[in-house]
From Swiss-Prot:
SUPFAM superfamilies: Nucleic acid-binding proteins
Key word Ribosomal protein present: yes
Protein name from the UniProt record: Small ribosomal subunit protein uS17
Gene field: rpsQ
InterPro entries: NA-bd_OB-fold (IPR012340), Ribosomal_uS17 (IPR000266), Ribosomal_uS17_bact/chlr (IPR019984), Ribosomal_uS17_CS (IPR019979)
One Gene Ontology MF term: structural constituent of ribosome
Lineage: Bacteria, Pseudomonadati, Pseudomonadota, Betaproteobacteria, Rhodocyclales
Protein family per UniProt: Belongs to the universal ribosomal protein uS17 family.
Record-level GO BP terms: translation
Species whose genome carries this gene: Aromatoleum aromaticum (strain DSM 19018 / LMG 30748 / EbN1)
HAMAP family: Ribosomal_uS17_B
Keyword set, alphabetical order: Ribonucleoprotein, Ribosomal protein, RNA-binding, rRNA-binding
PROSITE patterns per the UniProt record, alphabetical: RIBOSOMAL_S17 (PS00056)
Amino acid sequence: MTEQIEKVRRALVGRVVSDKMQNTVTVLVERRVKHELYGKVITRSAKYHAHVEDGGAAAGDLVEIEECRPISKTKSWRVAKVLEKARVI
């Protein structure tokens, strides 16, 4: 009975839009929803502050974030992994 049960955490995929803060990135998460009345597919977006260790993600990277305990007033997410690095032209 000493087994630890791992909680199922919510995970989202988004693009890093800002990495100017220390140990924090701003992630833009977009989702497509159908309008209830007119049926048109529209894009909804939300920005989340996510905790990142040692500059693991930079602006433009595609990252997966997962929910965690509140780290600060606005941070309750952390970067789980970097899915795709930003391309430099």
